[in-house]
């Protein structure tokens, strides 16, 4: 399981991408996911720093930086 912050976890097998929320296409993706009830907000009211795209068109918002999530996903050396 991948800790995405604040005690929230996702299955790494379902993870397709970890992206920054700053670009316009990603913002549109978030809006569409919210409209279709495919959005999970795991930020606990904090600023969104990473958008996780899961299979099944599920979008997860995280307050952790993408680099932090990738480091947690990678096995230790």
Swiss-Prot record:
Pfam families: RemA-like. InterPro entries: RemA-like (IPR007169). PANTHER family: REGULATORY PROTEIN SSL2874-RELATED (PTHR38449:SF1), REGULATORY PROTEIN TM_1690-RELATED (PTHR38449). Belongs to the RemA family. This is Putative regulatory protein tsl2331.
């Amino acid at each position: 399981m991948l800790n995405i912050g604040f005690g929230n976890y996702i299955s790494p097998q379902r993870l397709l991408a970890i992206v920054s929320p700053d670009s316009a296409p990603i913002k549109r993706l978030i809006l569409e996911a919210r409209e279709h009830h495919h959005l999970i907000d795991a930020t606990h009211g904090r600023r969104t720093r990473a958008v996780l795209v899961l299979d099944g068109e599920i979008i997860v918002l995280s307050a952790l930086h993408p680099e932090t999530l990738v480091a947690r996903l990678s096995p230790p050396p």
